Swiss-Prot record:
Belongs to the HHV-5 US29 protein family. This is Uncharacterized protein US29. Keywords: Host membrane, Membrane, Transmembrane, Transmembrane helix. It comes from the Viruses. Signal peptide: none annotated. The chain crosses the membrane at residues 12-32, 257-277. It is a multi-pass membrane protein. The keyword Transmembrane applies. GO terms for cellular component: host cell membrane; membrane. The keyword Phosphoprotein does not apply.
Length: 462
């Protein structure tokens, strides 16, 4: 059961993340064709006033999803004008150095194109898992880093997709670290926090002099603060641009990536089916589905499915079920059953008809291991004139037809074997002395076999 759960969880994870649209060269280009900006930061010369190291390499910013009330923005605007009125430039120059050296200018473009992203591993996922606000409103979709790509006219850049800004049609605040030289992948691949958050912004991974922020919804969304940092604001109403149509090259790359994703999905679904479908259906599919089709149905849906299976396997349709009130007779059964008027009763057995004799029984040897049926041997003598003549009568459980005695001398030698007290019994009913019951049994069996061989068994019951 645990193995099945593990496979189920793994398949669900891959279907959620692995089958999502992977942001590669074909996916990034049509997604981020919105307003973009470039923030350039130049290192201060050594002769300038000493600045804080953290302030030279980081830009302060405000998160887009942190709700900024109008009162707060008015307060900030009032502070900024107050700083300008109190000679804020001099204060910035002494606190942070030259403000113009921190931010040299902004540049807007709507035609960014990436290439050669396939040479590096891509970790960017788009349209993966949606994020929701506490009031159940879509806040954005989870996205991760990308890889080193060629941006525009052949410059190397590390493409990073950060979740939390805008919708998927605008790239979710995509950031590109633009570098002058060769781009090197960072040591940590997945973000621990948002790239543009309350406080600081991570420096560029390729070159600390140029950082691109684009995928914004309007030019006013990214602003330069009085301290020389980068801030986020809400776009005014009606200033959001419409996303442009993708190019042909982008569609080809998108289809190529989609085929790979579909292949991965098919393989994962096959693994899940191997866990769910029994092995008998794989080893003997015809016998398995034949047995399923012939099994009784429990519902209408089950009956319809099994009817389709019967048609596919070439089996006859199931017999029609009669209503519970009616009871129909099959035609074959009706033909075999004659009407009641033609029946004739068989004659009753006569009591005078003698029973057939039992099958002949041959007495086995006394030393045989087979159990010999108990023999009941009786002797009787005629009363009166025939007192001297003695006949030997043997009654057995399986006897032979009675035959007349041949000689009286031989018959007189016969003795009686009684049960359960086995022994040699004389005419007066006493057991011979000097013999135990075991010897009496063996001796009597020998005598009986000799009598049967010489004279046969005499029946005097009549």
């Amino acid at each position: 059961m645990r193995c099945f759960r593990w496979w189920l969880y793994s398949g669900w994870w891959w279907l959620t993340f692995g089958c999502a649209r992977t942001v590669t060269v074909g996916f990034v280009a049509p997604t981020v064709r919105a307003q973009s900006t470039v923030v350039r930061s130049e290192p201060a010369p050594p002769s300038e006033t000493r600045r804080d190291n953290n302030d030279t390499s980081y830009f302060s910013s405000t998160s887009f999803h942190s709700s900024v009330s109008p009162a707060t923005s008015v307060d900030r605007q009032f502070r900024r004008t107050t700083y300008d009125r109190w000679d804020g430039r001099r204060w910035l120059r002494t606190r942070y150095g030259n403000a113009s050296a921190c931010v040299t200018g902004t540049q807007w473009s709507t035609n960014f194109f990436f290439s050669q992203c396939e040479h590096y591993p891509s970790f960017v996922k788009l349209n993966g898992v949606q994020r929701w606000t506490p009031v159940r409103r879509p806040m954005g979709e989870v996205a991760y880093y990308g890889g080193c790509c060629m941006v525009g006219g052949g410059n190397r850049a590390y493409v990073i997709l950060v979740s939390g800004y805008g919708t998927a049609s605008y790239g979710n605040a995509l950031r590109v670290d633009f570098g002058r030289g060769n781009c090197t992948a960072p040591k940590r691949t997945y973000p621990r926090r948002l790239e543009l958050h309350d406080g600081r912004t991570d420096p560029s991974r390729c070159d600390p002099y140029q950082v691109y922020f684009y995928g914004l919804q309007c030019p006013e969304q990214l602003v330069i603060t009085a301290h020389g940092g980068v801030g986020m604001r809400r776009c005014p109403t009606g200033s959001r641009p419409t996303p442009s149509r993708p190019h042909r090259h982008d569609l080809e790359n998108e289809l190529h990536g989609l085929c790979v994703d579909l292949l991965v999905c098919v393989l994962l679904l096959a693994l899940l089916l191997l866990e769910l479908v029994p092995m008998e259906a794989v080893r003997h599919p015809l016998l398995f589905w034949r047995r399923v089709a012939l099994s009784p149905s429990t519902s209408k849906v089950d009956r319809a499915v099994k009817l389709c299976l019967r048609r596919m396997l070439g089996l006859p349709p199931p017999p029609s079920v009669a209503p519970p009130g009616e009871k129909k007779e099959l035609p074959a059964q009706a033909a075999l059953s004659p009407p009641l008027t033609t029946w004739s009763l068989p004659p009753f057995p006569s009591t005078r008809i003698p029973d057939s004799p039992p099958p002949p029984y041959q007495l086995r040897h006394a030393t045989s291991l087979v159990t010999v049926p108990t023999l009941l041997l009786y002797t009787s003598s005629d009363i009166g004139d025939t007192a001297s003549e003695t006949t030997c009568v043997a009654h057995a459980t399986y006897g032979e037809p009675p035959e007349p005695a041949r000689s009286t001398a031989t018959v007189q030698e016969c003795t009686v074997l009684t049960a359960p007290n086995c022994g040699i019994v004389n005419n007066d009913g006493a057991v011979s002395e000097g013999q135990d019951h075991g010897d009496a049994v063996h001796h009597s069996l020998d005598v009986v076999s000799q009598c049967a061989a010489d004279t046969g068994v005499v029946d005097t019951s009549e």
